Structures are given as C-alpha cells and as structure tokens.
UniProtKB/Swiss-Prot annotation:
This is Peptidyl-tRNA hydrolase. Hydrolyzes ribosome-free peptidyl-tRNAs (with 1 or more amino acids incorporated), which drop off the ribosome during protein synthesis, or as a result of ribosome stalling. TRNA binds at residues 14, 64, 66, 112. Its EC number is 3.1.1.29. Monomer. The record marks 91 as: Stabilizes the basic form of H active site to accept a proton. The lineage of its organism: Bacteria, Bacillati, Bacillota, Bacilli, Bacillales. GO terms for cellular component: cytoplasm. Belongs to the PTH family. The active site is at residue 19.
C-alpha cells in the first residue's frame, strides 16, 4: 500500500493558504478520483482507495503543521505502511511558486511539519515533493506570509502546479522508479 500525505493546518481560516498546498493537492486528488477523505483516526483524516489498480492511503493530519508526525506515524503503523511507500507533499519557501522539487530523503530544511515527521518516524528516509510558494517581500513576516491565501494570479500558477504534482503522485502510485519521476517532474511547471 502506498501512502500519500499532504501537510497543512486544520480549520477553515487556513484553507487555500500557502502553508496548506499539501492539503490542496490531496484534496484535488480525492476530488479527481471521486473519493471522500472522511475517515478519522489517530488525529488524521484519511481515505483508502484503489487508484489505477493500486491500494493507496491518503492522509491529511488533523493536527497543526508542527505536529504532523503525531497523526501520520500511528496511521502508518495501523495500516502497516513502510516509509519506503510514503510520499509527503508540502510547501517550500525557498523555491518560487511554480517549482517542484522531488527528493528521496533529506533533512527538514527548516520545515516544522517535516521535522515532526522525521522525529515521529525516526528517519528522514522518505520521499517528498516540495512545492514552491516563494518568500515574503518587504517587511512581511514569514509566519504571516505562509498563512495568507494565494493571490488570484498565484492561484493560476498553483493550479498548474497542483495538476503537475498529481501526475508525479500518480507515477509514484503506479510504481515507477522514483529517480525517473524526479527527472520528469523536478523544476518549473
């Protein structure tokens, strides 16, 4: 079973914010396969589905971003999913909007949601897709920036990014070599 985790913050006020791009991708994936992310266990919303003939666990932690591991680890344990079959989707301040960076492993890179996952999983050896959201300009604080909604112009770009990310996720679910997926999808959309 493959496991796809989108990171974000819970609550209506955080919907469509930069920090919730991981949730936005999972939501679009759920919508495109006519699924419902409506089961809850261990502080996480989840769905189990067959996507292109493969069994998939889709997760959105119902913790705040900085505690994501508290939801993901128990669900992975419960459904007996290994970190080899895990793919995490999340925002990245250090890349401009419209850029994807896929990695097989690595540090948290300053991202507290990933830090929580590494802490709870006990490893940084899991695949991830970092989705560029850009950095704030002027005197806007990072925390305020990531919790802002995308502008209409940014949403045009992010809509394309979400669709491209879903293609990469589908390739992962289909069992394509991750190196090939990285070669195909790393870069600007």
């Amino acid at each position: 079973m493959k496991c796809i985790v989108g990171l974000g913050n819970i609550g209506k006020k955080y919907e469509l914010t930069r920090h919730n791009i991981g949730f936005m991708v999972v939501d679009r994936l759920v919508e495109s396969y006519n699924l419902e992310l409506n089961q809850q266990k261990f502080k996480g919303l989840y769905a189990i589905a067959m996507i292109n003939g493969e069994k998939v666990l889709l997760i959105e932690p119902m913790t705040y971003m900085n505690s994501s591991g508290e939801a993901v680890r128990p669900l992975m344990d419960y459904f007996n999913v290994s970190t080899e079959d895990l793919l995490v989707l999340y925002d990245d301040l250090d890349m401009p909007p419209g850029r994807l960076r896929l990695r097989q492993k690595g540090s948290a890179g300053g991202h507290n949601g990933i830090r929580s996952l590494i802490q709870h999983l006990g490893t940084d050896q899991f695949k991830r897709i970092r989705i560029g959201i850009g950095r704030p300009t002027g005197h806007l604080k990072v925390v305020d920036f990531v919790l802002q909604k995308f502008t209409p112009d940014e949403m045009i770009v992010m809509d394309k990014v979400i669709n491209q990310t879903i293609k990469a996720v589908e390739a992962f679910i289909a069992g394509e070599r991750f190196e090939n997926i990285m070669n195909q999808y790393n870069g600007d959309v």
